[in-house]
Amino acid sequence: LSGGQAQRVAIARAIADHPKVLLADEPMSAVDVAARTQILASFAAIRSGEPDMALIMVSHDLGVVQHIADRIMVLHDGCVEECGLTETVLHHPTSDYTKRLLDAASL
C-alpha cells in the first residue's frame, strides 16, 4: 500500500467501531497531495456522518487545521498558548507565538 492508502486504511479501522473520540496524530505525514486531499475528504465525511464522534487531531500543518477543525489549541513548550474557535484563533490571534506561527505559515 502507498502511504496515503495505508493512512486511509488506518482511519477506516479507527472509525469502524464508532468510537466517541478519534485521536489522529499527524494524519497527513508522509502522504502526497492526492492522498492528503482524500484523507481530508475522509475526515470531512466523518464529521458529517458521525456527529457524536469527537475528532482530536494533532498537526503542525495549519492548512490542514484550517480545513478540519472547529476549535484549535496552540501549544508551545508543552503549554497552551491559545485556545478557541479556529476562525477566531487564525484570524485574530492574541498570542505572539500564534502570530509568528501564522506569519510563517502564510495563512
Q: Which positions does each model-derived feature cover?
A:
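Hydrophobic anchor residue at the start of the ABC signature
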Residues: I11, L23, I39
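Conserved catalytic motifs of ABC-family nucleotide-binding domains
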Residues: H18
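Helical segment within the ABC ATPase nucleotide-binding domain
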Residues: T37-P51
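A short, surface-exposed alpha-helical micro-motif characterized by mixed small hydrophobic
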Residues: V65-H67
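Short, glycine/charged-rich "phosphate-handling" switch motifs in NTP-dependent
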Residues: R71, C83
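C-terminal boundary and immediately downstream tail of ABC-type ATPase nucleotide-binding domains
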Residues: L90-L107
